[in-house]
Amino acid sequence: VQWSSSERSTISTLWGKINVAEIGPQALARVLIVYPWTQRYFGKFGDLSSVAAIVGNANGAKHGRTVLQALGQAVNNMDNIKGTYAKLSQKHSEELNVDPDNFRLLGDCLTVVLATKFGAEFPPEVQAVWQKFVAVVVSALSRQYF
């Protein structure tokens, strides 16, 4: 993937505005609520029986932060995203048996959370670059499956 200097700047600037502790839990909670079948991967989290339970779930919030921190690795390694996520892709494929489409669902939910949070600071041209970035990350995480 080729990144223009403008795209790199857009991703870097947006990432600099993201509060991992806030956005990560919101994005993961949204996945679990909007796509309830994804809850099957998180049995150890405890109660995920309602929206309130999901939003208030400390284990879910912690994992949401972990996921978003991992996304920061891609921001810092835009020239080698596939290499950055090789082991994580293998873990999700071979150990956790996660359906790789769930990475796309998470990316979509993260985009919704960012659009909600940043409003006018997340115009279509920023979203376009962000979507490209997320697509590359999803591809890298799905790599081990094929």
From Swiss-Prot:
Residue ranges occupied by any Globin domain in the UniProt entry: 2-146
Protein origin, superkingdom: Eukaryota
Heme keyword on record: yes
List of residues binding heme b: 63, 92
Gene Ontology CC terms, in alphabetical order: blood microparticle; haptoglobin-hemoglobin complex; hemoglobin complex
MF-aspect GO terms: haptoglobin binding; heme binding; metal ion binding; organic acid binding; oxygen binding; oxygen carrier activity; peroxidase activity
Keyword field contains Membrane: no
GO biological process: hydrogen peroxide catabolic process
Keywords: Heme, Iron, Metal-binding, Oxygen transport, Transport
Similarity comment: Belongs to the globin family.
Additional free-text comment from the UniProt record: This fish has two types of hemoglobin: one cathodic Hb and two major anodic Hbs. The cathodic Hb displays a small normal Bohr effect and a reverse Bohr effect in the presence and absence of phosphate respectively. In addition, the cathodic HB displays a large phosphate effect.
Name used for this protein in its record: Hemoglobin cathodic subunit beta
